[in-house]
Amino acid sequence: MRSTIEFLLNSERVCVPAAQGTRTLLAWLREERRLTGTKEGCAEGDCGACTVVVDSLPVCSCIYLLGCLDGKSLTTVEGLKEHPAQRAMVECHGSQCGFCTPGFVMALYAHYQNRQGTLCDALAGNLCRCTGYAPILAAGEKMFQYEKTQSSSFSQLAQDGVHHRRFSAPRTLAELQALLHPGATLLGGGTDLGLSITKQLRELDNVVYLGNVAELRELDDFPDHLRIGGAVTYTEAHAALARLHPDIGELLRRLGGAQVRACGTLAGNIANGSPIGDSMPFLIALGSSLELQSGSRQRTVLLENFYTGYRKTALQPGEFIRAIRVPKLASGARFAAYKISKRFDQDISAVCAAFHVDGKNARFALGGMAATPARAPRAEAAFAHGVEKACAALAEDFKPLSDHRASAWYRLTVAQNLLRKFSEAKSARAILDLQP
């Protein structure tokens, strides 16, 4: 295994000592390469001012670790030359105060390159609104009138893994198992771990990056379930999950911005154990399970049994999430998923809920209502006797807390109203409201 990280920076091959793998990409770009077009705004992956493009997808360089670039191609605003996104921004007078403009340009560049989703989705992760926003949208529409002015450049990069005491990036499951030990910190996309650097000023050590492990990047569609590898990102899993039910696709579209979804992983969201993680309620409601592995030993755990307390899980030392199994809905089953937050895009949920009824069997799961995402067994049992009895039972299942996002009363009232909405909806398809 190598002791260097290799990637392309604006088509130039770059080798960096693996010891620097735990630095943020933004810090390395500005301090080591003097590429200061990429700006720091929020330092937590929310505002998009630091957007760069990795393999045609936008990422937030403020929380993206340098080591994650191994084997990839990085483009910064300095590498665009005269791209249609830049030309359209100039012609439409899309520059605001200027500080966030490079981030907007890079988000538009990524949208131009991959042409996935809507323009509004592409810009949802860029939050600067200091002056006229309409010209930026106009630029996003106009740039497609122009042809590319540059061609992609590719260079053969090393195919083996990276290993250093501070940072490792294995390429195979065998390499990963050789590196795992109880003190290792497993890294998926870094959308949460990166905050420990930028906000808590931690110096990470013994980090093992999972994103290059081939076996963890598999996504298989079986007749009765999906099997999603532990390193599959939200962006990669979105289409398959959206086919299970439209509500899941709509909910995932609101999980962070495009920059977060491009590198954040479903398994990372699960392992993080946040009580307000957006993916867990719908996965629990569907009856999902986790394949856990340590060495040659494997076991399967239902996701609803995975959490043992606030940000505590059933993972044992040296164990990792190999894959997530997501059952498909049976014919005739009713399902809905809801996300309630103050802001429609790029916001943390106050309440996240999923309701699944198949015949006489009900599975209700909620986030933001307890120390962990959890089922509502009393409400499930009461639902057959009427929605009002089920709503009353929710108050027995959960005793939510008050915080800066919502009061306990608000959370419980919203959860009850969402259950009423599910019961009354003819199609049982959720309408993802901004307000309750």
Feature map (PLM): residue ranges:
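Short structural boundary motif marking the start of a folded domain
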Residues: 2-7
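C-terminal structural segment of proteins
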Residues: 8, 53, 57-58, 90, ...
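Structural motif
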Residues: 10-12, 71, 268
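Short, contiguous acidic and Ser/Thr-rich linear segments
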Residues: 12-21
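Short, structural beta-strand-to-alpha-helix junction motif
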Residues: 21-26, 51, 65, 233, ...
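A basic, amphipathic helix-loop patch mediating RNA/tRNA/ribosome contacts
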Residues: 22-54
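Short cysteine clusters
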Residues: 42, 47-50, 62, 97-100, ...
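S4-like RNA-binding module at protein N-termini
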Residues: 53-77
